[in-house]
């Protein structure tokens, strides 16, 4: 029996419901809804064509655009719905270029997952952590967050950007 692994004290449902950060939960739910609306409006196909056009048929330039656009967008849009939305865009770009989508997908992942560290609203973990800090009486301003987030993000993205391309290119 696994009963010995359970805590001795009982947790009341009411206590659990009080501990939930509903503001953060509502923000994340809203983000997912907006992204779904964008997808249904046909903007995904439009974005594929725009990115393909900007890259001019050059895979490295297209990869670069995807990475750095993802960094900037993920700084303000949660990276989970952004990545979910952009995966079909990247697939469309790869198809238009006639290439395997692997390097472009990894570029998306580098930009989106690391770009979310630029701002307090760029990643679910940042939103949740700031909500927890606020609930405990500590306010973290966007400026305070970004003084650490910007240099960390730039160093991490540059490293990932170069390494993904080098591994893809077979060096």
PLM regions and their residue ranges:
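Hydrophobic transmembrane alpha-helices of multi-pass solute/ion transporters
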Residues: 1-60
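Hydrophobic core of alpha-helical transmembrane segments in multi-pass integral membrane proteins
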Residues: 1-2, 157-163
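Small-residue-rich segments of transmembrane alpha-helices in multi-pass membrane proteins
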Residues: 19-34, 88, 92-96, 151-158
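C-terminal TM-helix exit segments that contain a strictly Trp-centered aromatic cap at the helix terminus
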Residues: 35, 119, 163-165
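Membrane-interfacial helix-loop connectors
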Residues: 40-138
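Interfacial loop-to-transmembrane junctions
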Residues: 131-155
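Juxtamembrane boundary at the C-terminal end of a transmembrane helix
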Residues: 161-171
């Amino acid at each position: 029996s696994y009963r010995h692994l359970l805590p001795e004290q009982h947790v009341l449902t009411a206590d659990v419901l009080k501990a939930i950060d509903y503001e953060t939960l509502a923000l994340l739910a809203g983000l997912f809804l907006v992204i779904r609306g964008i997808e249904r409006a046909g903007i995904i196909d439009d974005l594929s064509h725009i990115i393909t056009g900007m890259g001019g048929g050059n895979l490295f330039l297209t990869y670069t655009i995807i990475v750095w656009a993802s960094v900037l967008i993920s700084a303000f849009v949660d990276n989970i719905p952004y990545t979910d939305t952009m995966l079909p865009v990247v697939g469309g770009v790869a198809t238009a270029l006639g290439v395997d989508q692997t390097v472009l997908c990894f570029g998306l992942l580098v930009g989106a997952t690391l770009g979310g560290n630029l701002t307090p609203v760029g990643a679910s973990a940042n939103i949740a952590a700031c909500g927890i800090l606020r609930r405990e009486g500590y306010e973290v301003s966007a400026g305070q967050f970004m003084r650490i987030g910007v240099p960390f993000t730039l160093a991490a993205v540059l490293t990932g950007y170069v390494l993904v391309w080098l591994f893809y290119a077979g060096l």
